[in-house]
Amino acid sequence: MAIPEFTMRQLLEAGVHFGHQSHRWNPKMAEYIFGARNNIHIIDLAQTVPLLHHALQAVSDTVARGGRILFVGTKRQAQDGVADAAKRSAQYFVNSRWLGGTLTNWKTISGSIKRLRHLDEVLNSGDANAYTKKERLTLQRERDKLDRSLGGIKDMGGLPDLMFVIDTNKEDIAIQEAQRLNIPVAAIVDTNCDPKGITYIVPGNDDAGRAISLYCDLIARAAIDGISRAQGESGIDVGASVQPVQEEIPAAAQPAGFQGLAGPRGVADDLKKLTGVSGAIEKKFNDLGIFHYWQLAELDHDTAHRIGEEVGLPSRADGWVAQAKAMTAEAE
């Protein structure tokens, strides 16, 4: 195996280049911003590509040395991707609320992990029958609560050697703890974030579901590459090289060729101003990740028609695109 390859086209299709509204930017990200379009900052992917490759190399090298990678992503749209990637690459993750002291107070966290293991043993053995139904329910709730916070790190056995983070603003406490312990941090840094203290900066959209899935997939594959290298260096016959399956990045329920947003960039546009769009249709647009006129204005004929079919009014699609272009032009 080798470091996973990716193209700028993949990044574009995943919406990695979309930053936040220009008035919400962090000036410290200026060097990574290509420009602005419709008041949305555009990230310079010419810099993202080599920086992401550098981060992937760091992950692979860390795992090849026997190190541990901790995936951290507690925002809703990152939770599943972070957990799946960590499990697939035999690494560790936190995808629920970050508990203060997870790294800096590892001794206490280890005690909680020990309690989680004990509860698993009790509830999965015949000993559970010694408790009343109410007591078993209480133990199960305690176990579930601990598992949400610690289930992804209960087998880590010590501090991680590198931490991969989605959304540095949301995970600022985790990053501070890593910095105090000199643990390298690789992170996706959006235009509203502060890159200070991040060891491996990867400028990119930290909100779009497809972008997050792409990051997690690449980091997982880099970790798997590190495992393969470690086995090879230790003399283990890993057999003939097998071309890894190129997984399609899930596009949720969105039409092909279109990348929606996980949420509006600032204040959502009133899509009901478009001809024939009711509140119900607007909700369908939102479910597809469409919140702004500029998203519709950029659609080609085929993609617009597919979206029209999704919301139940394909005959209106071209008209919506034309109206959206006019409204976007007026806003400029």
UniProtKB/Swiss-Prot annotation:
Entries under Pfam families matching the protein: Ribosomal_S2
Q: Which NCBIfam families match?
A: PRK12311.1 (NF008966), rpsB_bact (TIGR01011)
InterPro entries listed in its UniProt record: Ribosomal_uS2, Ribosomal_uS2_bac/mit/plastid, Ribosomal_uS2_CS, Ribosomal_uS2_flav_dom_sf
Q: Which family does it belong to?
A: Belongs to the universal ribosomal protein uS2 family.
Looking at the UniProt record for this protein, which Gene Ontology cellular component terms does it annotate, in alphabetical order? cytosolic small ribosomal subunit
Name used for this protein in its record: Small ribosomal subunit protein uS2
GO biological process annotations for this chain's record?
translation
UniProt-recorded Gene Ontology molecular function terms: structural constituent of ribosome
Q: PANTHER family per the record? A: 30S RIBOSOMAL PROTEIN S2 PROKARYOTIC AND ORGANELLAR (PTHR12534), SMALL RIBOSOMAL SUBUNIT PROTEIN US2M (PTHR12534:SF0)
Domain of life of the native organism: Bacteria
Q: Which organism is it from?
A: Nitrobacter winogradskyi (strain ATCC 25391 / DSM 10237 / CIP 104748 / NCIMB 11846 / Nb-255)
Which terms are listed as keywords in the entry?
Ribonucleoprotein, Ribosomal protein
SUPFAM superfamilies (UniProt xref) = Ribosomal protein S2
